[in-house]
Amino acid sequence: MNVQKSNNAEETITPFSEESSLLNSNSYIPATFVDPTTIPQTSTEDIDIHGFNSIFDIPNLAWIEVSLLLNVFLAGFDGTVTASAYTTIGEEFHAANLASWITTSYLITSTTFQPLYGSFSDVLGRRVCLFMASGLFCLGCLWCYFSSGMVSLIFARSFMGIGGGGLITLSTIINSDIIPTRNRGLFQAFQNLLLGFGAICGASFGGVLSEVFSWRLCFLVQVPFSVLSIAVGFFFVKNQSGYSRFHHYCVLFKKIDILGGLLLVSGLTSLLLVLTFGSSRSIQTYRPSQLLLLLGILCIVAFVYVESITEAAPIIPLKLLKGLYSSLVLTTGFLIGLAGYAYLFTLPLFFQLVLGDSPSKAGLRLALPSLSTPIGGLICGILMHRNFRVGKLLFSGVFLMSLGYFLSLFIHPGISPIVLGIFLIPANVGQGIGFPSSLFSFIFAFPQNSHATSTSTLYLIRSIGSLFGVGGLSAVIQLTLRKKMLADLTKFTDLDSKSIQKIIHDVSKSISALYELPEAIQEIVLSDYTFSIRKAQQFTTICCVLALGLCILKDTIKPRTPSGFRY
């Protein structure tokens, strides 16, 4: 591949030394333009800086990978097990309107801490951070198991997310430390397979465990795997070369953007609380919603300001956001992250309410689409290895996601199980293609020495999209349901205003309250619930279609570079 230096501002970004070693071992390479539409080929003359000529020369590699891949499996398992079980949990605690926070609270902390683990591991060492992430995740699982109420469970999930944010990140970082560059793609493929396998297991067993035994087992079963990962890692995972433990505490606060992390957590939490309280439309929550909205905006503005002046490794390097191309790819990542999680967490509710599935059956229905995601990732990897253009892969992935979400609008109680299974496949295959191709579309627009920071930036933006996918869609369903029930139930002359408000309150708190209503009213409320879920599905489809439009726009506005390549 021909490469040249360019005067374009996006091509000469100064690397952040605190993070350049995390995901990229070649941070010493001079900043040169990389064609973002093709995959750069590794030259046979490339020198690996790890000191190993073969993966078979790495001491205790098998045991190290056992520890790391167990964490990756747990990350995939936890991501879908709550999707299968959150309706059951909401029922038990009579807080169905807060059930989305079981996932949202986890995503807030994991999203924020995920990029921080890179700096933490540089300063404190890989071992300490690996034990910290796995230990906090394990303790969070135990806290979830013993939670006595929804509020306690939400706090437990937040605590669990602090550790969860490092499970995949540290696995990638440690592999980058020890695996020769030419073999790293193979080990990344192992991670993707374990992540997909974990997601399949979580989707398949989450509903079964919550229905047959208890939803608490969904968290308890993760503890032995986490303990095993910690035990194996204790004996075999070592700190990175060049690490010194004698001065790390004095530079801890200089290298890690702790203030930025706190502002981001506060801002995201406030904005998501606005969605939760705002969906109730009650007088008691109206003023707090305004205050939370103001607080959220102020925290986000302050976060952006801190990122622009911090001397630490920023959570979001603002230099990477310059340029229309970068903005379009990041917005695409945000939208497909939002749509992907919204789709995943809407389906179990739809299956149980509209199709009449039990929690276990609804969970098993998610197994097939969960299997489709790693297949999509495998297809993406094969095509990228054959130099298939990344821009076309991104368009294809988002197109399949849009098609799948559109097909989900036609799922109805009388649909054939085979047809239903076919309808569920495209969205997840598209996600398996779209997620990695959006990452490479972004990072290959920058020089090699900026790939680490651009990777963490894209992951963070997509995770924020996932946050609003779960929290936002829950708010859409609750708000639409309340409005529709109020309009339809007022047509009953036998119901006064107080009775209507009680029905609305009970149904929003517990889905089982719906089946305790008189048959005529039950039919109306069930129809309203279906209507609300359909609105959420339509919103998800629109978001994905917008992302598809941005993919087209990205390919039409990308500037031509001096090397002759196009972004």
Swiss-Prot record:
It comes from the Eukaryota. It is a multi-pass membrane protein. GO terms for molecular function: basic amino acid transmembrane transporter activity; L-amino acid transmembrane transporter activity. The keyword Cell inner membrane does not apply. Keywords: Membrane, Transmembrane, Transmembrane helix, Transport. PANTHER family: MAJOR FACILITATOR SUPERFAMILY (PTHR23501), VACUOLAR BASIC AMINO ACID TRANSPORTER 2 (PTHR23501:SF81). Belongs to the major facilitator superfamily. This is Uncharacterized transporter C460.03. It comes from Schizosaccharomyces pombe (strain 972 / ATCC 24843). The lineage of its organism: Eukaryota, Fungi, Dikarya, Ascomycota, Taphrinomycotina.
